[in-house]
UniProtKB/Swiss-Prot annotation:
Alphabetical UniProt keywords: ATP-binding, Kinase, Nucleotide-binding, Phosphoprotein, Transferase
Keyword DNA-binding: no
Function: Catalyzes the synthesis of activated sulfate.
Reactions the enzyme catalyzes: adenosine 5'-phosphosulfate + ATP = 3'-phosphoadenylyl sulfate + ADP + H(+)
GO biological process: hydrogen sulfide biosynthetic process; sulfate assimilation
Keyword Ubl conjugation part of the UniProt annotation: no
Name used for this protein in its record: Adenylyl-sulfate kinase
Amino acid sequence: MPAHQLDDHNQETRSDDENIVWHPHAITRQDREQQHGHQGVVLWFTGLSGSGKSTLAGALEQALFARGVSTYLLDGDNVRHGLCRDLGFSDADRRENIRRVGEVAKLMVDAGLVVLTAFISPHRAERKMVQDMLASGQFIEVFVDTPLAICEARDPKGLYKKARAGELKNFTGIDSVYESPASPDIHLQGEQLVTNLIEQLLDVLRGRAIIKS
C-alpha cells in the first residue's frame, strides 16, 4: 500500500505515487451543503464498550433525520463486516481500522452529510489522525463518559464477561488501555437518560449553526 500524506491547504489525502493524481470536481462541498441546507461534519463518538456510543449515535441520527438533515452512521461493528473485515484487534490493525473509517467519513463530509461515528477508538493519536484529515470545525469529538462499572454491568454483547474470564484478549478497559479525550468538544455523562443527552447534542449543533432547528 503506498504511503499517504495530508495536504494542509485543501485537506486532500495525497498518495506518494506520482502516477496517482487528485481529480477536482465541478460540484464543490459548499454546493452540496447548500443543497442539503446544512454543513457537513463528523461527530466522533468515543468511549468504552457499553458506554452508549452506538445507542446515542443512532438516536441522534433519528432526531436529525426527522429534521430533514442528511446523515449517515458509521458503526464500529458494522464496518468490520465489509470495509475492515480483514483487520483484527492489534494496535496496528486498530489504527488502520480508524484510518479507513476516517477516510470514508471525510468523503461523506465532502458530500455535505452529517456523519455520526461510533467507535471505541481508544487512543488519542488515532482520533487526532482523523481530526487532521478534516478542515477546522468539521470534526466534533463526543466523549461518552460512562464509568467502567456501569459499562461492565450493561455488557450488551457479553464481552466484558469473556475478557474477565481470559477468553478475550486486548479488550479495552480490562487489559488494554483507553485514553480519555483531554478536551472533547462534547462531554456526555453516559448514565443520563438518552433523551437528555440527545437534547444536549442538538443544542451544540444549533449553537454551532450546523443545523437550524
